[in-house]
Amino acid sequence: MKILNFASLNIDMVYDVEHIVSPGETILSLNMEIFAGGKGLNQSIALARAGGNVFHAGLIGDDGEMLKNILAENNVNLEYLKTANGKTGHAIIQVDKSGENCILLFSGANHQISTDFAHEVLKDFSKDDILVLQNEISNLPYIVKTAAKKGMKIILNPSPFNEVMEDIDLNDIYCLILNEIEAECISGGSIDGFENWAKNNYPDLKIMLTLGKKGAKFISRDLTAEHPIFPVKTVDTTAAGDTFTGYFVVGISENKPIEDILKYAAAASALAVSKKGAAPSIPEFKAVEEFLKQN
């Protein structure tokens, strides 16, 4: 089974700050570093480090060579990673002393993905291959509909949540991975009623709900499972969700019991928040195993 991550790649400029800047405020940063990032790149690295057979499809600009190199170093297949005219997507990230972050995105080449390019990528994948998607690339509804017609298992992380999601038929989605805010946005109601909304409107849809400090909850027609977070010192939360997604998807692809999938995904996410940076913080599978032996 192949895992295709059709997704974004960004250059992350990370600024350490005393506190997240407020409107009209100017502050000095304590430090600045540049990392490879983007939800798509982070998730491809997490997928690969979790042991998945992952292909990354997407676009970079001529300034994105470092992103290509880090994916190659992590054994991600780059057959469908192409170079477009213009600049690579980038993010300006503030990280405060508690590890919380605030992110400003420039889409760049991520929003140059055409329907023709999407068609050329998807023609090489087939029924039951897994397609991982986020909402940081252009023509997402076309990609979803085309992949669904092929019978691919589509796992969608609707982040950042915006009006594009109105054009996505959730009946085409195998599994949604989302946090509480995204759950409220997609359902149009409170988080308390989300589970009933999902079961009443999309009974076959699997839901992976990440709940921050309250852990994670998996919801499907047949079962519900929960797992708490592992208590660690938080340094940087930037790649926590992407790390969780990568380990979760690989677990699904390997048909592991959901309790084991949640345990490994939670452990990987805990390790990710204990280090600075996005891609550099994503743990290898062996590190997750060692962590679980000690916790």
Regions found by a protein language model. Name each.
Residues 1-23:
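Positively charged, low-complexity intrinsically disordered leader regions
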Residues 56, 81-83, 93-130:
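Conserved phosphate-binding/catalytic loop of the ribokinase/pfkB sugar-kinase fold
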Residues 205, 228-295:
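Conserved post-catalytic alpha-helical subdomain immediately downstream of the catalytic base
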Residues 45, 90-94, 102, 215-219:
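Short beta-strand scaffold segments in enzyme catalytic cores
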Residues 148-226:
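Conserved phosphate/ATP/ADP-binding segment of small-molecule kinases
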Residues 48, 148, 253:
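Gly/Ala-rich phosphate-binding loop of Rossmann-like dinucleotide-binding domains
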Residues 2-3, 23-90, 286, 290-294:
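Substrate-binding N-lobe of the ribokinase-like
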